[in-house]
């Protein structure tokens, strides 16, 4: 799994490429969480155009980031 990050004001765009599964979910989650907290991100776009597979760990990453962004009063798009 590769992930590129882009910033558009208070919006973080995470472009993922590959398989989002148990082997990389924790790393993806930690990277996004760190960026949200470090840069005061309130909106998150997760670009899954190049994701070929996602298991329940990946769904957990999505749900967790949604809750985090919602608590900040922001929006998340997938």
PLM-predicted stretches and their roles:
Residues 1-15:
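Short beta-strand/loop segment at the start of cytosolic alpha/beta domains
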Residues 22-78:
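Amphipathic alpha-helical interaction surfaces in cytosolic regulatory modules
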